[in-house]
Amino acid sequence: MTNTGMFELCYLYYDEKTMEHAKRVANEAKSLCNLFTSLPYTNNFVYQLGLAHDLYEDTTIKRGVWFDRDFEENLQLLTKEKDVNYNDYIAKIRKMAINPTYMPAYIVKLADMHDHFAQVNTLTDKLKNKYMAAMPYLI
């Protein structure tokens, strides 16, 4: 899928606030790619994953239809299921990142956490504590 195609797909499912968050995450993730020189994926793959990172968790999009296998597996890894503890979810992303196939999900999660911390006007104490508690599991 092209970057334009991913934008169009995300615009169909995200509200304006979520789309703005997704764009910030995508841009940050693309920048972080420069730190990982052995990444077997292009910056565009990581950028698109950043855009799509909340599709399964926060929308009604049908899973397993839109993306190729590698993208789908990374997106599934980024999707926190409701019955999973947040710290366990973060720890799984970190553990899976040992395999270069899943490094894009790790990069996107780093960018996602950074964006949440950067939104000081909307970062509640509850969210701040949640993300701070999860950081040791991610880094």
Q: Model-flagged regions — what are they?
A:
Residues 1-139:
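Active-site helical microenvironments for divalent-metal-assisted chemistry
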